[in-house]
Amino acid sequence: MLKKATLQDIENYLDFSYNLSQDLTTSAFPTYLDGIKTKNDFYKSAYSSFSKSNSKILLFINNDEVLGWIDYYWIEQDHYLGFNVFNIQNNQQEVIEEFIEYSKSRYPNYTIYFGFPSDNTLSIEYLKSIDSEKIDENYVYTLSFEKYSPLECDGDIVSVNIENWNDFRDLHDKTSDIYWNSDRLFNALNSKSNKKWNIFLYYEKNILKGCIYFVYTPLLMEIFGIDYKDDFDENIMRSLLIKCLNTSKLDNQKHTTFFVEEKERKIVESVGFNFITKYELYTISLTD
């Protein structure tokens, strides 16, 4: 069964949950095996989730034994259910099934986003067997800026601004179903949060050919994506990626993470990224 965690529960089982996070077969994304997030970060995240109004921590209990820890959150305006932690020692199928049933009455018409490393085969195989939709699959890489030396990049690359915003919007919003569309990015760029977004545009003969968008958080720099006017282009990707990394190092960022496709792997490896694991994202729609 699933039980809402009390503060005492958190103190009792925090180490247990962290230990599960150190195994790709028993944990989910965000991963704590990336060499970036620490045990202290895990603890801070748990207590933060406990105190927020849009997140909860649940314990999975079977035969009076705690076997799992779910730290989830919701975004009401987007009908979005996601996870900070989904660490299950065993009985993964039962836990996923229970969480879906638990959520149906509490979050009708929401969509649950389950992100797992491919190593977590029990969870993934169960999601494949039910009415879920696989919407993403990527290879996860990280880079330490302490070990990164700035590289030369080609092309006419500029920061996004009010004059070229329409160029960016037209290119970026060609993909209609992404969460970080141009409207959300515009609001994020102009917000006063502790996350600083950056967007660079790659021009050829005054025509926008590609763009990269990434964010500085208190913990790391995260690259969210690279868009192209036409087909995937290795030179454009490499140039935008180097511009992003050079800028981030200059801004004293410490680490970065990047989720890439198979065709992009050799490019990120050539500039110093290290492979962590493969990521798979599944959704469940909580509709009647």
Give the label of every model feature segment.
Residues Q89-C153, L240-C244, K254-D288:
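Acyl-donor-binding surface of acyltransferase catalytic domains
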Residues K56-L58, H79-L81, E137-Y141, N198-F200, ...:
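Short beta-strand micro-motifs in enzyme catalytic cores
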Residues M1-D41, L151-S182:
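Short amphipathic alpha-helix that is part of the acyltransferase structural core
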Residues K174-L250, K254:
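Intrinsically disordered, low-complexity segments enriched in Gly and acidic/Ser/Thr residues
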Residues M1-D15, D23, S129-D131, C153-D156, ...:
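Short, Lys/Arg-enriched, disordered terminal segments
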